[in-house]
Amino acid sequence: MELSISQSPRVRFSSLAPRFLAASHHHRPSVHLAGKFISLPRDVRFTSLSTSRMRSKFVSTNYRKISIRACSQVGAAESDDPVLDRIARFQNACWRFLRPHTIRGTALGSTALVTRALIENTHLIKWSLVLKALSGLLALICGNGYIVGINQIYDIGIDKVNKPYLPIAAGDLSVQSAWLLVIFFAIAGLLVVGFNFGPFITSLYSLGLFLGTIYSVPPLRMKRFPVAAFLIIATVRGFLLNFGVYHATRAALGLPFQWSAPVAFITSFVTLFALVIAITKDLPDVEGDRKFQISTLATKLGVRNIAFLGSGLLLVNYVSAISLAFYMPQVFRGSLMIPAHVILASGLIFQTWVLEKANYTKEAISGYYRFIWNLFYAEYLLFPFL
């Protein structure tokens, strides 16, 4: 440790290694400090004992000030409202519990279909429809939350291997709280639909909840069987969502249900797309599925084969969309539909190539699956303008 004393009333301590003046031919005073002798320059003198004490007092006073200030900062950090902190953590856990990427798909899909129905019937648009549309979106989010939530409750062991970041698997949300949330989502969704959309749409909504239940809950737990699992996901996310939202929107406009070519296209397109999502969603989970003896196409056929199968089915979708634009120019805007789907198909081919070059690592598989969801969002964003 070095003690430097100068003419100014400042005292400087350093924890660096001693850097003292080398011994010279001239005699210099020294000060004994903690068993060590520190050489001092010749012109430095302690004029009186009081000066030394004043300097010691200065150092001690400043040390106490710094110490008090540091302690007060620590105390302030520790005195943050624990209730607000718990609320923030619970909100974060609930948001992760809802699986945000599925919420985005549900919200975009319903918004796109409502927008398309309104574009086809602009003369029937009125402000009272906004509240009805928002209530429908709320019901869909509740249904989505119920389905993904109950799946997490029955997949805790698997998620600790495959998805340890999910709130129940991570210990951020208790099973009891999760049950309360899924029960709330189911009841709230059914009430909103029942009061706003009539018995037929309520029946479709109930069917979606039922399919989501048997997908995850024993003894049926249909997710154990690949074909049944794919059909359930494709039915709920593909057909029921698109048909139900479009039917409800036309009913709110006072119109009978009638298929239009664009709506038939998006329903078919998204149903096949949902099938691809159902196939590829197990790609990042192969390790946990094998450990818990869950039979999926990925565990049976291998990650590479399923990735190529998923990409191939999506390419069929894109080729069909481009063909429709050529075949029905009076229905679809070919100037948008053709180049947009060429770009999306090219992106899919490139992402599949990236996955192949990465040798199907877990990170590359996760990136590929996220890209598929981005393609899903992109189709709904395009749909109102096709």
Curated annotation (Swiss-Prot):
GO molecular function per UniProt: homogentisate solanesyltransferase activity
EC number: 2.5.1.117
Location within or outside the cell: Plastid, Chloroplast membrane
Superkingdom per UniProt: Eukaryota
Interval spanned by the transit peptide: 1-69
Database matches in InterPro entries: AtHST-like, UbiA_prenyltransferase, UbiA_sf
Assigned keywords, A-Z: Chloroplast, Membrane, Plastid, Transferase, Transit peptide, Transmembrane, Transmembrane helix
Bilayer-crossing regions: 130-150, 181-201, 204-220, 225-245, 259-279, 306-326, 335-355, 365-385
Record's bilayer topology term: Multi-pass membrane protein
CDD domains listed in its UniProt record: PT_UbiA_HPT1
Top enzyme category: transferase
Classification via Gene3D superfamilies: UbiA prenyltransferase
Protein activity control: Inhibited by haloxydine (3,5-dichloro-2,6-difluoro-4-haloxypyridine).
Catalytic activities: all-trans-nonaprenyl diphosphate + homogentisate + H(+) = 2-methyl-6-(all-trans-nonaprenyl)benzene-1,4-diol + CO2 + diphosphate
A Gene Ontology term for the protein's cellular component: chloroplast membrane
One Pfam family in the UniProt entry: UbiA
Function text: Involved in the synthesis of plastoquinone-9. Can use both homogentisic acid and 2,5-dihydroxyphenylacetic acid gamma-lactone as prenyl acceptors, and solanesyl diphosphate > farnesyl diphosphate > geranylgeranyl diphosphate >> phytyl diphosphate as prenyl donors. Do not catalyze the decardoxylation of homogentisate uncoupled from prenylation.
Annotated PANTHER family: HOMOGENTISATE SOLANESYLTRANSFERASE, CHLOROPLASTIC
Similarity remark: Belongs to the UbiA prenyltransferase family.
UniProt protein name: Homogentisate solanesyltransferase, chloroplastic
Organism: Arabidopsis thaliana (Mouse-ear cress)
Gene coding for it: HST
